[in-house]
Amino acid sequence: MLGCHSCHDPHGSARIDSTNSVVYPQIGTTFPPIVDSGSYGTVPAAGEAVGVYRLLAWDGYQATGMTDTFDGVPAAIVPSTYNREESATPTRTAYGYGATDGFESWGLWCATCHEGMHETSAGSPSGVVHKTDDVLNGIATNYNAYVKTGDLTGVATASYTSLVPFSTSANGTDIATLAALAVNDGSVADGPANGDRMNCLSCHRAHASGWKYALRWNNEAEFLTLGPPATPVYPGVDAGMGNQGQFNQGYTTAQMEAAYNDRPAGLEFAGHQRVLCNKCHLKD
């Protein structure tokens, strides 16, 4: 049975040292002490270390009752105030890409348990619905141009949305690099570079999604909002649209807004906003 301990090690001793390498204490070795959490951007000085992000499972970790073993830790930094509404500005979790020095990419880390969903390159096997950890290349251009349905005037310096995050590749395990991106005031809104990567969390939440399959948006219908392009509305059951259940999944207008981290419908969406697969794929 899955539990919190399936992904998090409550007594984990893995740590990140001042060279941005993951260190695993072993008998007969010396290693730097942990001086702070590894989740919020503290950069350890020489001879010090911080914990790994969210005490996530590390190389060799196997939870009680599980048969799969993790091969490293993924990289990320989050603002110190993270569990908040996003009615005005997004909470930007800075995900990083790493595959050396004790790190593992987000896609491979998640695939420890979700093997059937993972793919790293084209030519997906039967049943696999999306590749992950791939370099974005031209998809980054799409992401940066996409503002909302009917608007492709975006610029790379203002294109980020926390509804479709991505992994930073350049210095992707460097704490200082990720900490500079992890803001909640909208001051860093840069979208991806061509070398950055999508990951499982680009489309899914790890916890507490309001939508099926732990997705970040309602993917059960073609529209996230209804109404005219300039005045979108969430089609809640209390908005006179209760007969259009595919759009609201039985939620009220307030519940739909809450499922999007308290975003007003007009903050990032157009009327008849299509699903956010289009942030990368431009098919709307």
Please name every model-derived segment:
Residues 1-284:
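A motif-centric signal for short, conserved binding hotspots located
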